[in-house]
C-alpha cells in the first residue's frame, strides 16, 4: 500500500497546545506526552506550543507512528509546525524479491507453507526408510505368520531367521526380498506423512497452560498420531501383508479383487483392533523417548545429525521390545482364514500353539529393521524441521532489511 497524506490547517489559534484537543486515539502530533516513547524509537521532538498558525500533514502507520516536525518562524514572529506521519507498506511489500531468494537459497524453502513442508517431509522420510529396510520386513512377516499359514497339520510350527532368508532367496530370488514393497511404499507415504504431521499437531493441542509439554502430553500426542495414521491407511497395510506372505499373488490389484470377491469389504479391516492397540503405545513410546532424550542432551549436541540417529535407535529399541507381542497378534489376525476372533483369543492361541516365544517370532529381523527405519525417518524429519526453522529466520532477516531500507527518516528538527 502506498503512502497516503491529508493536510489540516489551523489558523488564528493562539497558544495552540496539545491539551486543546481530545481525540479517541493518540494523535501523532502530540508533543509533551510522546517525548519519551518516541525517543526510544530514536525520534526527536520540537517544542510543545504552537502559536498563530499550525498545519498538520498526517498519514497513519498501522504498527507505529513516526513524525517529522519542522518549526519555522512565520510572519509576526509566529511559529509554523508541520507533522508528517508515513503509512508503512503492507508486510508482503517487504517480502524478499526473486533476486534476494536466489542469493539466499535457504529462504526458498519458506515459499512452501510450513504445514505442507512438514507433511511432505514425513512422506519422504517414511518412503526412504521403508525401501532401505524392506528385505528385513519381508523376513519378519514370514517368521511371524508361518505357523498360521502352515496349518494345524504341519509339524513345523515356526521358521528361523536364517531359514527365512534362505527360503526367500531359493524360491523367489533377489526380487523376493522386496516383494510387497510397492504397496508398502504406497502406504507408507501417506502413513508416515500423516503420522509425523499429526504428532506435531497433537503436541500443540496437548501443551499445558504454561505452554510446556509434559511426558504424558508427549505420550498422548504419539498415541493419537499413531492411531490417526493407522486408521487412514489400514487397508493398504492388509494388502501389503497378503501380497508379502500368501502365494500366488503378483500384484496389489489381484489381492484387492480377490479379497473383495471372497471375503468382502470387512476383510480390509481384519485385525484393526490389535493394530490400534499395538501402534498407539509403540509410536507413543518411540516419539516420546526420542524427544526427551534429544532434549536432555547438551545444546551443542542437539543440533548434530549423529545425535538424532543414535537417539532414534534407542527410542526404537525400547518401543519395539515393549510392544512387539501386539504386533505379532495383529499380523496373525490379518491373514486369510485366521482362527482368531479377538486379541485375547489370539494371545492365548499363540501361546498354546508356540509358547511365549511365539509372541516374539521375527523379533530379531524386526529390531534390525525398526532401528534403522526409525533412525532414517526421525532423523530426516528432524533435519527438515531445522531447515524450515532456518528458512523462516532467513526470510525474517531479509524482510527486516527491506523494511529498514524503505522506512523514511524520522523526526528531523529544523529551526
From Swiss-Prot:
Protein localization: Plastid, Chloroplast thylakoid membrane; Plastid, Chloroplast envelope
TM helices/strands, residue ranges: 106-126, 182-207, 219-239, 273-293, 309-329, 362-388
Membrane topology field: Multi-pass membrane protein
Record entry for activity regulation: KM and Vmax values toward ATP only are increased by m-chlorocarbonyl cyanide phenylhydrazone (CCCP). The corresponding values for ADP are not affected.
GO biological process, one term: photosystem II repair
GO molecular-function terms, A-Z: ATP transmembrane transporter activity
Top-level lineage group: Eukaryota
Disruption phenotype: Plants show a 30-40% reduction in the thylakoid ATP transport and metabolism.
Organelle transit peptide: 1-61
Solcar repeats: 113-205, 213-296, 307-387
Keywords annotated in UniProt: Chloroplast, Membrane, Plastid, Repeat, Thylakoid, Transit peptide, Transmembrane, Transmembrane helix, Transport
PROSITE patterns according to UniProt: SOLCAR
Binding site for ADP: 187, 330
GO CC entries: chloroplast; chloroplast envelope; chloroplast thylakoid membrane; plasma membrane; plastid; plastid envelope; thylakoid membrane
Any matching Pfam family: Mito_carr
Expression by tissue: Highly expressed in developing photosynthetic organs such as leaves, flower buds and green siliques. Also detected in roots, flowers, mature leaves and stems.
Function recorded in the entry: Specifically transports adenine nucleotides. Involved in the uptake of ATP into thylakoids in exchange for lumenal ADP.
Family: Belongs to the mitochondrial carrier (TC 2.A.29) family.
Protein's name in the database: Thylakoid ADP,ATP carrier protein, chloroplastic
Organism: Arabidopsis thaliana (Mouse-ear cress)
Amino acid at each position: 500500500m502506498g503512502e497516503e497524506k491529508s493536510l489540516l490547517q489551523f489558523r488564528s489559534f493562539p497558544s495552540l497546545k496539545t491539551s486543546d484537543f481530545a481525540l479517541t486515539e493518540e494523535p501523532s502530533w502530540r508533543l509533551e506526552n510522546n517525548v519519551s516513547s518516541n525517543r526510544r524509537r530514536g525520534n526527536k521532538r520540537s517544542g510543545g506550543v504552537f502559536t498563530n498558525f499550525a498545519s498538520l500533514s498526517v498519514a497513519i502507520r498501522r504498527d507505529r507512528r513516526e513524525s517529522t516536525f519542522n518549526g519555522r518562524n512565520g510572519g509576526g514572529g509566529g511559529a509554523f509546525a508541520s507533522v508528517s506521519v508515513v503509512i508503512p507498506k503492507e508486510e508482503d511489500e517487504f517480502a524478499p524479491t526473486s533476486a534476494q531468494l536466489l542469493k539466499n537459497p535457504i529462504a526458498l524453502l519458506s515459499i512452501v507453507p510450513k504445514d505442507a513442508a512438514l507433511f511432505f517431509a514425513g512422506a519422504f522420510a517414511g518412503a526412504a526408510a521403508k525401501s532401505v529396510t524392506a528385505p528385513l520386513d519381508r523376513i519378519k512377516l514370514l517368521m511371524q505368520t508361518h505357523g498360521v499359514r502352515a496349518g494345524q497339520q504341519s509339524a513345523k510350527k515356526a521358521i528361523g531367521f536364517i531359514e527365512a532368508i534362505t527360503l526367500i532367496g531359493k524360491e523367489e530370488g533377489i526380487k523376493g526380498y522386496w516383494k510387497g514393497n510397492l504397496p508398502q511404499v504406497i502406504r507408507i507415504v501417506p502413513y508416515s506423512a500423516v503420522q509425523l504431521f499429526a504428532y506435531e499437531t497433537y503436541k500443540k493441542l496437548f501443551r499445558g497452560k504454561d505452554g510446556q509439554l509434559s511426558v504424558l502430553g508427549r505420550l498422548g500426542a504419539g498415541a493419537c498420531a499413531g492411531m490417526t495414521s493407522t486408521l487412514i491407511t489400514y487397508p493398504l497395510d492388509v494388502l501389503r501383508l497378503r501380497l508379502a506372505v500368501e502365494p500366488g499373488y503378483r500384484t496389489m490389484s489381484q489381492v484387492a479383487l480377490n479379497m473383495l470377491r471372497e471375503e468382502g469389504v470387512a476383510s480390509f479391516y481384519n485385525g484393526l483392533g490389535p493394530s490400534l492397540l499395538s501402534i498407539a503405545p509403540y509410536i507413543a513410546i518411540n516419539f516420546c523417548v526420542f524427544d526427551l532424550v534429544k532434549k536432555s542432551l547438551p545444546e551443542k549436541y542437539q543440533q548434530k545429525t549423529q545425535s538424532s540417529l543414535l537417539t532414534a535407535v534407542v527410542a526404537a529399541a525400547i518401543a519395539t521390545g515393549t510392544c512387539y507381542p501386539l504386533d505379532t497378534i495383529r499380523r496373525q489376525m490379518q491373514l486369510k482364514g485366521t482362527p482368531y476372533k479377538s486379541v485375547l483369543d489370539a494371545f492365548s492361541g499363540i501361546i498354546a500353539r508356540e509358547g511365549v516365544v511365539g509372541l516374539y517370532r521375527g523379533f530379531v529381523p524386526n529390531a534390525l529393521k525398526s532401528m534403522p527405519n526409525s533412525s532414517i525417518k526421525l532423523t530426516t524429519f528432524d533435519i527438515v524441521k531445522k531447515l524450515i526453522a532456518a528458512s523462516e529466520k532467513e526470510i525474517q532477516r531479509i524482510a527486516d532489511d527491506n523494511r529498514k531500507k524503505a522506512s523514511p527518516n524520522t523526526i528531523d528538527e529544523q529551526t
